[in-house]
Each structure stands twice: as C-alpha cells, then as structure tokens.
C-alpha cells in the first residue's frame, strides 16, 4: 500500500508535520479549513514566479501566522518590503484576523519536490521534451544530496493522440518505510494538447520523529557488552553445572565404570 497512499498523509504524526497547525471545534472547522484552502490558492497564483515550496498556516489566539518557504525570498518581499505589506493587507482582509507573514528561504531548491514539479511543468509548457526535463531534474537532485528521486509524467506526452504514463527513478525511494523522509509534490502543465500531470518523490534520508533528527540505534540493556568481556570468554554456567573445569557433566555412560569380575578390557 505504500505505492498507492499519499506519502505525506501516510507519515503524519510519525515523521511529518501538518501544513495547517490549529484547532477548531465542529462549528468553526469547515469555515477555517475553507479559509486555508483559499489562502493557499491565492498565494499560489500571486507568487507564481517566486518559487514557493510550501505554506504553513498557524492560528494562535485570534491571530494568524503564515510561513512561506521560497527559494527566492527577494521576489516575495519586493523592493523595500512593499510587496509583502500589500500581501499582508490582502491576507488580513481574507482571514479577518491580524496576520503575521514570515519568509523562510529554501537553501537547496533542486531537492524540493514542489519546486522540481513546478520547474518540469514550466518546461513542458515551453515545449521542451519531457524526458530531457525529467532527467535533468533527477541529475541535479542527486548531485545536491538526495538519496533517491522518482518522477512520473502522465498525459499526451509530446502531443501524441493516446495519453500514456512514463516515470524514471534514480537511487532508492522506500515508500513503505515510515521513518524515511519522502518529499512528495504534484503539479500540472497546461499545454495546447491538454493537461500533463507531474508527480515527484524525493528521498532525503531517514528521520526520527517530526524534528528531522537523525536515526540513532539504541543498544538494549540486555544487549550491552560486559565491561571486561572478551570474545573467548565462557558462557555463564546453568544451575547444577558446577565442578572443576575438566569435570565430566551429567551421569556416567553405561558400562563406563569398573570392569565386571572375570572380564578384562582389551
């Protein structure tokens, strides 16, 4: 099932965190969720050229904190911070509460799944061959530290009449392993022949918990080596196995005692 389920939803509360971090009762949940969806669609359209990887929305105490992860933070902020002030004003109007906007820079955009998918779709819209775009993205990701990447494109590739699906993979992408840090994203290319869908999986290594800490194997208490133990040491004796080291354990073999009268051993 790891091949079918959404990789992010499969790992929520295990190795991934939610993109919307707030709590609401049953009466307000639907309205707040609809607000989040509208904000994400607005930011995706407004910051189309800013290389936005993901958006995290938090709602602490009748406020809203929106964190935008972008590889081009200068485009989001604008000249002297003008663009971000206009953005903040529009978000406050949409959400109805004071909004704080934070910008986080993505250091390695070549290994971010959303940015890879968006880059491929932009190339497809410019009529670049899909194989060339996919292989170039895979090479850049592996060169900058990704342990594995898989890219899938589906639709009327190169304008053919019958739609098909093609995918390429490099490295390893363990979708069943919960501790594996799998970054997954999708994007759509709107071409003259129709829509081409792009899916990207990027394996960045194993994590422990939601803080992206490295996995450290703990040694169990009963498996810890003894302080002065050596490889050639004897195993501990069981009860009833005392005696000298050369003593024979257990009952003597039958006929192994004194020879009977009139018989001598040969």
Curated annotation (Swiss-Prot):
SMART domains: KH. Residues 230-241, 257-266 have a biased composition (Basic and acidic residues). Disulfide bonds: none annotated. The keyword Ribosomal protein applies. One of its GO terms (biological process) is translation. Keywords: Ribonucleoprotein, Ribosomal protein, RNA-binding, rRNA-binding. One of its GO terms (molecular function) is rRNA binding. It comes from the Bacteria. Residues 218-266 are annotated as: Disordered. One of its GO terms (cellular component) is cytosolic small ribosomal subunit. Transmembrane segments: none annotated. It holds the Pfam family KH_2. The keyword Ribonucleoprotein applies. Residues 39-107 form the KH type-2 domain. Belongs to the universal ribosomal protein uS3 family. Binds the lower part of the 30S subunit head. Binds mRNA in the 70S ribosome, positioning it for translation. PANTHER family: 30S/40S RIBOSOMAL PROTEIN S3 (PTHR11760), SMALL RIBOSOMAL SUBUNIT PROTEIN US3C (PTHR11760:SF19). Part of the 30S ribosomal subunit. Forms a tight complex with proteins S10 and S14. This is Small ribosomal subunit protein uS3.
